[in-house]
UniProtKB/Swiss-Prot annotation:
Cofactor dependence: Zn(2+)
Residues reported to bind Zn(2+): 50, 96, 284
GO molecular function: ferrous iron binding; oxidoreductase activity, acting on single donors with incorporation of molecular oxygen, incorporation of two atoms of oxygen; zinc ion binding
Leader sequence residues: 1-25
Keywords, sorted A to Z: Dioxygenase, Metal-binding, Oxidoreductase, Signal, Zinc
Chain's gene name: tasH
Name of the protein this chain belongs to: Dioxygenase tasH
Job description of the protein: Dioxygenase; part of the gene cluster that mediates the biosynthesis of the tetramic acids Sch210971 and Sch210972, potential anti-HIV fungal natural product that contain a decalin core. The PKS module of tasS together with the enoylreductase tasC catalyze the formation of the polyketide unit which is then conjugated to 4-hydroxyl-4-methyl glutamate (HMG) by the condensation domain of the tasS NRPS module.
CDD domains: 45_DOPA_Dioxygenase (cd07363)
Amino acid sequence: MRSMSLWMLIGPVTGIATWASLRYAATTTTSSTAAASTRMGLAPVIALSHGGGPLPLLGDPGHKSIIHSLSHRIPKILSLNDPDRRPRAIILITAHWSTAAPTISGAANPDLIYDYYGFPPETYELKYPARGDPGIAAEAAAAFRAEGLGDVVVDPGRGWDHGVFVPMTLVRPEADIPIVQMSVLASEDPTSHLRMGRALRALRAENIAIVGSGFASFHNLRAMMAMRSSAGSRNPEGARIQAISREWNSALTDVVDKNPWQGLEGWRSLPGADLMHPPRGGEHFMPLIACAGAAHEEEKVRWYTDEYLGVDIYTYYWGGSDVE
């Protein structure tokens, strides 16, 4: 998470997690099947929640539900265990890279950027040796230009931040699927992010999945610390945040389900938006907007929830396999 270490608030945990040993039952809701995406032959789109810093890779108990979903649900949505259906590459839009213009990582073998501080030494030695794909990066840049998105940049030196390697270590520990990383816009302009997603629709037809890595339901560090220190709903402030979170998630899910383009253009007017994502602090919401733009109008969204700090954290997806 940006500009703060949660490690000092949490204390030591159990060490780098053994993914196969983690099991957790969380909530899933399905609004339709994946039939439209299957008919069109499109790779899935997923706006996932990546957790706080490297904590999902440390087995942090507060991330138990998120860890389970990253290591079990997301691979199922992407059909990663089916060699005939798994995507040939992933375009990953990360909340931890904000730029003035749409920017795409063009490196064939990206380094990792350990953009967190105050964590155990082993978190600065993590490796995720998946390849980049300069050809797909160039294709995505051309799609952005065709959409009229301005001065698109392909950055051959940019490494992968923890919005990429932390969730992907859980999603695909084999690290055998190429990844192209994309920035969000510092302007936080929702229409531009919707258009970024729309530009990527054609790449879905080439079996390239689109993954947004953020924290769409809740990314307010001050409120998160209040929830952790107050033991959640046992404190009046925690109960207040939980109530606002429920109202926000209900309104947001209704918008994403029924009117994503117009509704997300006006997302700041949704109840609770400024608490869940403080003004000028909406970067962790932008990947969801781009993912919604990458979905075709006839595709219906599905979602599941994870528990985090006593509130529901939603992951939205279009296409792919249903999960429970």
